[in-house]
Amino acid sequence: MADTMQFDLVSPERSLASLQARAVQIPGAEGDMTAMPLHAPTLTTLRPGILKVDAPEGTTEYLVTGGFAQITAEGLSVLAERAIPMDEMTRAHLDELIEEARTMYKTAQEDNSEHGLVEDAAKMLADMEALGTHMSL
C-alpha cells in the first residue's frame, strides 16, 4: 500500500500546496472526511473550515471558505474559493471573512432569494463565526 498521495491546493489567488501527504482532513459540506492514499474516487463540496494536511514533513492547516475536492486513489485536488495558511491567519483576515458572510446573508434576505440561498448564507455566517472561536483569534 502506498504511504503517501499527491495533494494540491489552489485558490483563485495562488497555488498554496503541491506535496506528498499521508492524509488530509477535509471540511466537506456533508460532513468532515479524511482522504488517504488509495481512497475511493469522490467529489465533494467544501464548507468553511480547517483543512489539515498530514505530510512526512509535518502537519499544515489552512482555512478554506468553500470550494471543491476531488479525491482519487492517487491523490487529492482541492479548488478552494479562498484558502489561507493558518500561520498567516490574523484577526483582520477573520473579521473580513465574517463581514463578507454577513453581507451575503443580508443581500440574500433583501433580495427575497430562494429559501435555500438564505439558509446557505446563514450557514456560511455561522461557520465563519464558529471558526473564530475555534482559532482563538
UniProtKB/Swiss-Prot annotation:
GO cellular component: plasma membrane; proton-transporting ATP synthase complex
Entries under Pfam families matching the protein: ATP-synt_DE_N
Keyword match Cell membrane: yes
The keyword ATP-binding appears for this protein: no
Lineage: superkingdom: Bacteria
Protein family (similarity comment): Belongs to the ATPase epsilon chain family.
Oligomeric and partner information: F-type ATPases have 2 components, CF(1) - the catalytic core - and CF(0) - the membrane proton channel. CF(1) has five subunits: alpha(3), beta(3), gamma(1), delta(1), epsilon(1). CF(0) has three main subunits: a, b and c.
Purpose: Produces ATP from ADP in the presence of a proton gradient across the membrane.
Protein name per the record: ATP synthase epsilon chain
